[in-house]
């Protein structure tokens, strides 16, 4: 567990993205509003609109679902590309996230799906996050592809987004130089930015042509 869980990605993604040398970033800014701690772990759409403006060399795809989509309808999504309304199950979602170079999100269940399928993700954590992630580490032994950016002070998202912007600016530049960067290359760059050595562990993979492994 968790890589041994038998999850399968759909054979065909619910949308296709033209390949180019721009970094593809999936985003989510809020989890389930029925979760008691969601107000502390979630942010507003405006945070990610500012992030997209700070990294114009990247393309940002909204995987947001639920009430968070109302913000898109009220304020408009530009320059984000909203794809969260194109899939409704984990299989289709898994196929969709595999088209991204990485995802940047506040803590939601999608982090676990990214981890299972080896998709690089930067999980933005509030000061006292889900107990499973501890209080200090930038990585977790549960998933090779998950990295954490944590609040250094309670409620301070400004610092978190400044740091993730610097990571994405660096990644976008690397992607311009090397359009064929794979998940492992992306993850290595993220870990370098965090000052963490990349150490991949051997874990069993789902018996599917869409394996939960970094390639």
Language model region names:
Residues 1-190, 210:
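Catalytic machinery of carbohydrate-active enzymes
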Residues 181-215:
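Boundary detector for helix-to-coil junctions that initiate low-complexity/charged tails
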């Amino acid at each position: 567990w968790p890589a041994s869980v038998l999850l399968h990605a759909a054979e065909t993604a619910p949308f296709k993205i033209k390949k180019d040398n721009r970094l593809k970033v999936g985003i989510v800014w809020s989890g389930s509003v029925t979760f008691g701690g969601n107000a502390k772990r979630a942010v507003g759409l405006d945070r990610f609109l500012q992030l997209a403006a700070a990294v114009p060399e990247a393309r940002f795809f909204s995987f947001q679902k639920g009430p968070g989509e109302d913000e898109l309808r009220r304020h408009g999504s530009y320059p984000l590309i909203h794809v969260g309304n194109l899939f409704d199950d984990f299989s289709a979602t898994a196929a969709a996230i595999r088209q991204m170079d990485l995802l940047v999100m506040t803590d939601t269940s999608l982090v676990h799906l990214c981890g299972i399928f080896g998709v690089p993700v930067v999980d933005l954590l509030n000061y006292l996050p889900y107990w499973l992630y501890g209080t200090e580490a930038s990585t977790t032994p549960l998933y090779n592809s998950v990295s954490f950016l944590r609040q250094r002070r309670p409620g301070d998202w400004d610092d978190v987004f400044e740091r993730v912007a610097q990571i994405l600016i660096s990644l976008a530049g690397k992607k311009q130089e090397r359009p064929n960067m794979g998940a492992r290359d992306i993850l290595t760059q993220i870990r370098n930015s965090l000052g963490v050595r990349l150490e991949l562990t051997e874990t069993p993979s789902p018996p599917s042509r869409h394996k939960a492994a970094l390639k």
